[in-house]
Design a protein with these regions (language model features):
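Acidic/charged, solvent-exposed loop-and-adjacent secondary-structure segments enriched in E/D, K/R, S/T
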Residues: 116-137
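Extended beta-strand-rich segments in extracellular/periplasmic secretory proteins, especially
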Residues: 140-197, 202, 231-279
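N-terminal mature ectodomain segment of secretory-pathway/periplasmic proteins
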Residues: 2, 33-37, 44-122, 148-197
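Bacterial N-terminal signal peptides
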Residues: 16-29
Length: 372
């Protein structure tokens, strides 16, 4: 059975670890020395400047080479991590390593493979994300339709650690998503500081870089995992087409405004290798993972065999450091929605799951339920 608490790490890290990184970056003077990658003063002042800065930041995160060590602060938890990102002729390879505790690592290959190493669980998870975003790609970016659900505006420039920065506010228009603040370096377009904020404006997640460099070349050895793999259990996420027929028939009948299906995959869970479908819904910034897992069924015991107990289903809301998970049971399946979004978003999606034609597209609500 899927553990909602573990989904914050294994599910959204996600198989989208990027949203875990939707928070604050503090760069060091090494950034200012990046004269070879300087992109000029950037956009001036005007109505479209905030969007232009988000577009430049997105390009910088996608296409630059960079190596950094940062502190990820989420609730009371602080974790030190190191990221290596290389773009070689449009082929991106990345490695993300936890420098604390168990020493977990994540490697994203240019062929779409995402390999997650969990030495504390003696497990390696292999997923396929053909068009997967970079690990820092969960930071806000401007895309078609995003401004229907967020107010995007430029705030007065500031100075941060000796750098001139442009400050961008991304505020939600309804109760289904969180907001952001970003401090973007005007020379390199890299985000030097960001914040993920709740509806009350409280900062709920941060990342602070202790070092950040952008070398012209990154050798292959810097992108190789350092975790021993002898004797570990390998879990391979299967393509979406191999999901069980029962799981494929379950879909949200409705979604919060702006959310749509962006990724569909399947994996096996537990020693019994039960199939679990993994669906990702996004509005362009916020992301929710939906896991649909067949519930184990009790078997008629043999005369001399005591039947194994069937675990109780998970139901209700659970909070992790910077988001929520909501679990329920639909048609004999455990359904769990998890994401760095308000509680009502995961509840809405999980509660809307119905047995429908797997080919049908869930519809978004026609209007935003409330505005701030």
């Amino acid at each position: 059975m899927i553990d909602p608490a573990g989904l914050a790490t294994l599910g959204t890290a996600r198989l989208r670890f990027a949203t875990v990184l939707g928070a604050a970056l503090l760069a060091t003077p090494a950034l200012a020395a990046d004269a070879g990658h300087a992109t000029g003063a950037g956009p001036g002042t005007g109505a479209g400047d905030a969007r232009a800065w988000l577009e430049r930041m997105t390009r910088a995160l996608d296409t630059r080479n960079y190596i950094g060590t940062f502190f990820h602060v989420s609730g009371p938890r602080v974790e030190t991590m190191r990221i290596v990102h290389r773009d070689r002729d449009g082929r991106v390879t990345e490695r993300l390593e936890s420098l604390d505790g168990a020493g977990r690592e994540y490697v994203r290959h240019s062929d779409g493979r995402l390999i997650c190493y969990f030495p504390d669980r003696h497990t390696v998870l292999v997923a396929t994300r053909p068009n997967g975003a970079p690990f820092l790609g969960g930071l806000p970016k401007f895309g078609a339709g995003v401004d229907r659900f967020y107010r995007i505006r430029e705030l007065p420039d500031q100075r941060l650690l000796g750098h001139r920065v442009t400050v961008i506010a991304v505020d939600p228009k309804d109760q289904f998503r969180f907001g952001y603040r970003l401090w973007i370096d005007r020379r390199t377009a890299m985000p030097l500081k960001t914040e993920l904020r709740d509806a009350q404006g409280h900062v709920i997640e941060q990342i602070l870089f202790a070092s950040l460099t952008m070398p012209a070349r990154i050798p292959d050895r810097d992108l190789e995992a350092h975790v021993p793999t002898s004797g570990v259990r390998w879990i391979v996420q299967r393509p979406a087409g191999e999901a069980s027929a029962g799981a494929a028939a379950l879909r949200p009948a409705a979604l919060p405004p702006g959310f749509r299906l962006t990724v569909a995959g399947a994996q096996t869970i537990g020693a019994a290798h039960r199939p679990a479908e993994h669906l990702v819904y996004s509005d362009g910034l916020a992301t929710v993972s939906l896991f649909i897992e067949p519930r184990p069924q009790p078997r008629a015991p043999a005369a001399t065999v005591t039947p194994a107990p069937v675990p109780a289903p998970m139901r209700g809301l659970a909070r992790f450091d910077s988001g929520f998970a909501f679990s329920t049971v639909v048609g004999g399946h455990q359904v769990t929605a998890v994401g760095e979004v308000p509680a009502q978003t995961v509840e809405f999606i999980a509660h809307s799951v119905r047995a429908i034609d797997g080919r049908a597209s869930p519809v978004a609500l026609p209007t935003v339920l409330s505005h701030r």
